Structures are given as C-alpha cells and as structure tokens.
Amino acid sequence: MSPVISHPRSAAARHQSDELSPITITVDCPAKTNLTLEVGPAHDEWGGRHELDTIYCAIGVYDTVTATAKQPGAGFSLELEGAYLGDLASSRSDMRRNHAVLALFAMAQAAEREPDVALTITKRIPVGAGLGGGSADAAATMLAVNRLWELNWPIERLRTIAATLGADMPFCLTGGLAYGTGFGERITDIAPGSRDELALIEQGFSGEVLVGAYQSQLSTPEVYHTFDIVGAAEGDRNHLQAAAISLHPRSGQAIDAATQAGASHAFVSGSGPSVVAFAADEAAAQRIIEVWRDTAVVDRIIRAKSPEHPNISVRQ
C-alpha cells in the first residue's frame, strides 16, 4: 500500500478566500546526470556544501507529480506510488522532509497562501542513486503549483526559490542541458543546436543512454565525506566517482564492463551509485546491455533518451 499522510493547517491559520481550483496538474520531470562534475572546496556560507562546476543533462527517466487543490483549511496530503520507492516507503512518520513537500511549502510561503494541495508522486527514478529523483520531484511540484495557483511566475523566480532547497532543483525545472556553478544552483542553459551542444555531441554524449541502477543507495553526505579523504582520480570527469566506487565497488565494475563493450562514455552519475553509459548506436547499446546482464554488475537496466525536459499537462 502506498504511504499516505495528510497535515491540516492549524485553526489559527489565515483564511484563504480563493475559490477551489477544479483542475489537476500533472508534471513528468526527468532525471538528471552530470556529464562533468568538478568539485571544489566546501564553503561555510553554503552550509558546508562544496563548490561545483558541472554540465547537467536531463535523461528520460521520469517521476510524475500530480497536484490537485484541496478545500481551504484541509492542509496538504502526499501519496507515493511506484515499485522503486527505496527508503521513501519507510519514511511515513516525517513526510514533511520529502523534497516535494518542502517545495510546496516554499511556494506557499512565497505566494503568501496555505499549502492546501494533494500531491501524488509516481516514482520511476531510482532513489538515492545520483539521478536527482528528489530534485525532480521538487521541481515538478513547483511547476505544478505555479500552474495550479495561476501564479505564472517565470522560471528565474522559480529557480531562486529552488536554490534555497537544493543544488539540482533549479536545473530540474527546465531540464535539457545546462552549466551549473556555485553549489550547482547557478544555471546557464545550453540552447539546442548551439555550439556548446554540438561540442558535447562531438565528444560522444549522444545516441542511446543506458542507466545501470541498484537496489542499494548511497548517502550524498557520505560520498562527499569520502571525497574529502580520497579526492578525485586522475582522468575522472566526475570528481565524486572514485569516492562512490570506494563505497560501492559494483559501480566501477559496471563502468569497466560498459567501456569494454564499446560505450562512448561510462561514469558514475552524480554521487552514485547509478552508472550512466552512452552508446553511439543500437548495436553498442545491445552489447552494453548484454554484458551488464551477463556479469550482473547492475541490478536494473533503464534505456533513456537525452536531453529531455519536463512535461506539464492540465486535466479539468
């Protein structure tokens, strides 16, 4: 059974006079990976987060967030669905820490209204996998609420709010390709057909995208702590890769297997443990799939496209 929890607001909460919206907003938001991820020093003013210089890429593994307005005073509710909930399924006691709920609260505070919204999240992006699933859920919630409440705020305003919640969330609002700096929250989009996108294609970041996923998860703080000890390996485009592999050796085995099978690129996604492999064509993709299956170096294989973008739909 999907975990469901509802939090009504207090009796002292301000009366909200807006009429209940009759519509439901559904947002499909893709996962993210990092084509490059350079990690710099930690900054106290950023709460100990590290300086990052990255190229984000949205890949076609989608979580779906559905938002429906509730009666004034009803508070929020959250329902989680899907076969790959990870530790989210055991977090019923504190749904207020869910990224989507935090995003809902942030939007409500910025809009000066109550978070009387029913959220349903269908999870397909692996949890704790370095694929930005929580960030995708938060971004999808912000996009949904922006439409549900008819705020019509521009992306830049949404990104300002998202930056207070997490590093990847500002990127996930738009997906595609983008540069990320600061602690990852400062986004410069890479336009389709631009010189920068063509350069990435020439480097082999095109064609089939394969994700090797795992039942196990990695804690992002633990990966960064390990990075502070072991540093980055020479030649790694992802500075966190060595740390992730030291904590989850199968990721390294999956990278080696994909590379030997002809992957254009194979690397740990973000803080791991998921591995992303780019294949130039269908034949290369099939070789990678076969070797991953034969060697059992991953638990689940996902085929995806890139770069992808969020999709928003409205139902009366």
UniProtKB/Swiss-Prot annotation:
This is 4-diphosphocytidyl-2-C-methyl-D-erythritol kinase. Transmembrane segments: none annotated. Belongs to the GHMP kinase family. IspE subfamily. Keywords: ATP-binding, Isoprene biosynthesis, Kinase, Nucleotide-binding, Transferase. Catalyzes the phosphorylation of the position 2 hydroxy group of 4-diphosphocytidyl-2C-methyl-D-erythritol. Its EC number is 2.7.1.148. GO terms for molecular function: 4-(cytidine 5'-diphospho)-2-C-methyl-D-erythritol kinase activity; ATP binding. The keyword Nucleotide-binding applies. Pfam families: GHMP_kinases_C (PF08544), GHMP_kinases_N (PF00288). PANTHER family: 4-DIPHOSPHOCYTIDYL-2-C-METHYL-D-ERYTHRITOL KINASE, CHLOROPLASTIC (PTHR43527:SF2). GO terms for biological process: isopentenyl diphosphate biosynthetic process, methylerythritol 4-phosphate pathway; terpenoid biosynthetic process. Coiled coil: none annotated. Pathway: Isoprenoid biosynthesis; isopentenyl diphosphate biosynthesis via DXP pathway; isopentenyl diphosphate from 1-deoxy-D-xylulose 5-phosphate: step 3/6. The active site is at residues 32, 168. It catalyses: 4-CDP-2-C-methyl-D-erythritol + ATP = 4-CDP-2-C-methyl-D-erythritol 2-phosphate + ADP + H(+). HAMAP family: IspE (MF_00061). ATP binds at residues 126-136. Disulfide bonds: none annotated. It is an enzyme of class 2 (transferase). InterPro entries: GHMP_kinase_C_dom (IPR013750), GHMP_kinase_C_sf (IPR036554), GHMP_kinase_N_dom (IPR006204), IspE (IPR004424), Ribosomal_Su5_D2-typ_SF (IPR020568), Ribsml_uS5_D2-typ_fold_subgr (IPR014721).
